[in-house]
Each structure stands twice: as structure tokens, then as C-alpha cells.
């Protein structure tokens, strides 16, 4: 069943046949909006139905009605109607086409159902008569776009099918969820505008295939980096450059999701383009995907230069001794002045809250972990000194890592 029916009137200054009119419509609209919106292509794909023409001749003039069933959406159907109005010739004769009406066939069908419902109810009699208003309300509710649900302890905006879907789409905010729901995507969940990736997203990502769908601007880049540092992602999809997910049409959403890129392919392309952080993100994603780790060793030349040029103040040894057994950390400036002394339990959060390159070195009474290294690399800390070294899978040549024993 078609969604809409375009009704148009045609007037021609001459006597023509129906097939002449249909041929003129196909011929004069061909190629105006490219092959994708060609009437023959639309018919082949079932997007529009068979064009019907009813004519009558009076003297030397022909008038008639054109009927075109459409399965396109509202905007595309209106565009199609405007397109056929551009036909101004049928054979050698001048012609004009004007749109009389665009009928929503679904609403017409619902109207007939409602009329028939009332008729049936009247026949049943008053004692069997249900509340017609409730019936109408139920039908209206059925036709409404689903509202986002609140998911997880963080009450993240989401579609109704997140739990039962094998694959989910992760977007930025509530407006993105609403837009995707409008076009039938129900396996979506938003980050909720949180500064950090919610635990609910991390847990879902461990259990399901995930596509991260972000805006096509700098904001989308920042969100992508934050998510890739914290949650397992299988595919990346992006809105067109400069566009936001919440404003995309059904077709634009479909095209963006069709063009989604496998996460490691995407990050490897970023590495080739000179994105320094992409190599770190590859290691993080490999760990989140539970793949064998690729230990990246710094080039020997660079490592040698770091060793040769590293200069530590004498007072640092005294600071290290004062840290033994305290479970505390000290932040240093580039001049080796103490900037801050904090409990080790707050170390990662304090690093993440700092500005890049504000911290030159960190010394702490604790274990150097991969999570800690990821945090200091992001903030471009130069030296990290801890009590012991844990399991390390990746570090950059720019970061010097030492233990208390090496400096004792």
C-alpha cells in the first residue's frame, strides 16, 4: 500500500493520448535531480507506483487528471509533486500541470476504519458499546513517535530495545535519541551529556556490538576520543561534516550508518594521517576487546636520548623517602617545585582534571598501571615515578617511567 497519492490536473493545447502525457512526464523530469530521483528508478525500486492518467478532449484541447501513488516520505513526495509541475510540453503542444491535492492514504484508511468501527458499535447496541474516545486515543498513541526511556542508574536517554538488541548505537544526547526514534531506530542510548563515560555504557559495550555515532564537528571528535579511551567500540559512524546527528534526515542517518568504519581500521587511518593519540587509542581498544596486546617499544635512539638528558634534583630522593608507606603522590612543575600532594586514590581523577602540560612529573607511593600511564600521556606528563611497576602494554617514548628502586 502506498503512503500518499498525488492528484494533479493537466491542460494541453492540443489533442494527445494518455501515453503521450506519461512519456512527457518521464522525459522532461529525467536527470533533474540525478539518477537517484529518476522516476523510472523510483518505480523499479517500488518507491512510486504506476502513473495513471484520465483524459477528455474538448475541441482542440485535452484536459485530465494525473494520479501518482508514492511510498516516499513527506518531503520527498512534495518534491516529486513540484517536479512534475515543471512539465510544460506534451508533444508539440503547450501544457500545464498543477497539483490539486496530496492525499495521505494511511489517514484515509484509518478514517474508513474509524467510520466502520462506529458503524459496528452502533449495530451492537448501547449495552456493548465501548468508549470510542478511548479507541481513538489508543490509535493516536500507536501512531506517536516513541518517547525515550530512562536506562540504568544514570537514567540515560535510550530507545526501548537496548536490552534485547544484539547491537546498539551510542549517541551524545537526548535530542539525538529522539531523532533516531523518529525514524525507527530503537536500539540507541545516549551518553547523557556526562563529562565521563557512564558505567552503564561501559557495561553494555562489553556485552554487545557497538556503533559510536557522533556529530561531524570538533565536538564530535572530542566525544569520540573520550569514549574510545573508556569503552569498547566496534564501529565509528559520523554525521556529514558540520552537521549534528539530531538534525539529520532519515536518509542521511541511513547513509551515515551504512558508511560506518570498523574501529581498528578507523584508528589505523588516523595514525597514517599523523594523529599521535590514535596509536594509544588502538592499544586501549585492543585491551577492551581482550585482544593480544601489541607491546610498542620506543625507538632505541629516542630512549637513549631520554636517558642521557634526564636530570633529577637531589631533593627528589628525600621526597621519595618521605612518601614510603604514605600512599600519597606529589605533582611537580617543570622547575621541580611541588605543586600538589594528594592521596593515591585520587591520582587518576586529579590528572584527568588538570590542564595538558601543567604537570611535569609525578612521584607516588603506589603501582604504575596501564590506566595511570594512559591518563598521564593524555596530559603530556614527562616523568612518572612509582614504588613498583605493574603490567604495562604500551607507553610513548615521550614518557619516562622509573621506580623507587632504580633511584635508591
Swiss-Prot record:
Cofactor: binding details: Binds two Mg(2+) per subunit.
A family per Pfam: Toprim
Annotated coiled-coil segments of the chain: none
GO biological process: DNA replication, synthesis of primer
GO molecular function: DNA-directed RNA polymerase activity; metal ion binding; poly(A) binding
Domain of life where this protein originates: Archaea
Residue numbers binding Mg(2+) 2: 215, 217
Assembly, per entry: Forms a ternary complex with MCM helicase and DNA. Component of the archaeal exosome complex.
Named cofactor requirement(s): Mg(2+)
Top enzyme class: transferase
Catalytic activity annotation: ssDNA + n NTP = ssDNA/pppN(pN)n-1 hybrid + (n-1) diphosphate
Organism field: Desulfurococcus amylolyticus (strain DSM 18924 / JCM 16383 / VKM B-2413 / 1221n)
InterPro entries per record: DnaG_primase (IPR050219), Primase_DnaG_arc (IPR020607), TOPRIM_DnaG/twinkle (IPR034154), TOPRIM_dom (IPR006171)
Designated name of the protein: DNA primase DnaG
Binding site for Mg(2+) 1: 172, 215
Biological role: RNA polymerase that catalyzes the synthesis of short RNA molecules used as primers for DNA polymerase during DNA replication. Also part of the exosome, which is a complex involved in RNA degradation. Acts as a poly(A)-binding protein that enhances the interaction between heteromeric, adenine-rich transcripts and the exosome.
Gene name of the encoded protein: dnaG
Amino acid at each position: 500500500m502506498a503512503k500518499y497519492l498525488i492528484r494533479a490536473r493537466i491542460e494541453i493545447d492540443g489533442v494527445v493520448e494518455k501515453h503521450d502525457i506519461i512519456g512527457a512526464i518521464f522525459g522532461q523530469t529525467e536527470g533533474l535531480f540525478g539518477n537517484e530521483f529518476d522516476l523510472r528508478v523510483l518505480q523499479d525500486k517500488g518507491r512510486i507506483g504506476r502513473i495513471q492518467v484520465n483524459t477528455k478532449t474538448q475541441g482542440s484541447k485535452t484536459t485530465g487528471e494525473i494520479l501518482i501513488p508514492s511510498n516516499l516520505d513527506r518531503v520527498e513526495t512534495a518534491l516529486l509533486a513540484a517536479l512534475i509541475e515543471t512539465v510544460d510540453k506534451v508533444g508539440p503542444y503547450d501544457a500545464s500541470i498543477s497539483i490539486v491535492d496530496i492525499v495521505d492514504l494511511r489517514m484515509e484508511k484509518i478514517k474508513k476504519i474509524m467510520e466502520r468501527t462506529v458503524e459496528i458499535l452502533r449495530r451492537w447496541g448501547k449495552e456493548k458499546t465501548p468508549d470510542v474516545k478511548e479507541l481513538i486515543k489508543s490509535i493516536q498513541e500507536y501512531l506517536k513517535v516513541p518517547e525515550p526511556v530512562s536506562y540504568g542508574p544514570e537514567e540515560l536517554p535510550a530507545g526501548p530495545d537496548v536490552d534485547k538488541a544484539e547491537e546498539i548505537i551510542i549517541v551524545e544526547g537526548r535530542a539525538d535519541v529522539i531523532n533516531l526514534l523518529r525514524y525507527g531506530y530503537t536500539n540507541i542510548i545516549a551518553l547523557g551529556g556526562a563529562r565521563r563515560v557512564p558505567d552503564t555504557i561501559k557495561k553494555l559495550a562489553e556485552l554487545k556490538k557497538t556503533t559510536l555515532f557522533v556529530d561531524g564537528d570538533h565536538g564530535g571528535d572530542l566525544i569520540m576520543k573520550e569514549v574510545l579511551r573508556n569503552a569498547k567500540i566496534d564501529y565509528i559512524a559520523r554525521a556529514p561534516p558540520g552537521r549534528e546527528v539530531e538534525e539529520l534526515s532519515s536518509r542521511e542517518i541511513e547513509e551515515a550508518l551504512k558508511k560506518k568504519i570498523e574501529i581498528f581500521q578507523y584508528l589505523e587511518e588516523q595514525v597514517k594521517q599523523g594523529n599521535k593519540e590514535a596509536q594509544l587509542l588502538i592499544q586501549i581498544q585492543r585491551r577492551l576487546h581482550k585482544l593480544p596486546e601489541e607491546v610498542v617499544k620506543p625507538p632505541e635512539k629516542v630512549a637513549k636520548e631520554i636517558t642521557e638528558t634526564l636530570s633529577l634534583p637531589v631533593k627528589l630522593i628525600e621526597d621519595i623517602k618521605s612518601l614510603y608507606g604514605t600512599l600519597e603522590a606529589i605533582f611537580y612543575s617543570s622547575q621541580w617545585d611541588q605543586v600538589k600532594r594528594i592521596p593515591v586514590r585520587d591520582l587518576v581523577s586529579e590528572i584527568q582534571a588538570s590542564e595538558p602540560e601543567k604537570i611535569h612529573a609525578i612521584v607516588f607511593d603506589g603501582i604504575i598501571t596501564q590506566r595511570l600511564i594512559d591518563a598521564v600521556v593524555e596530559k603530556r606528563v614527562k616523568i612518572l615515578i612509582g614504588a613498583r611497576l605493574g603490567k604495562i602494554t604500551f607507553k610513548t617514548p615521550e614518557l619516562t617511567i622509573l621506580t623507587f628502586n632504580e633511584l635508591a
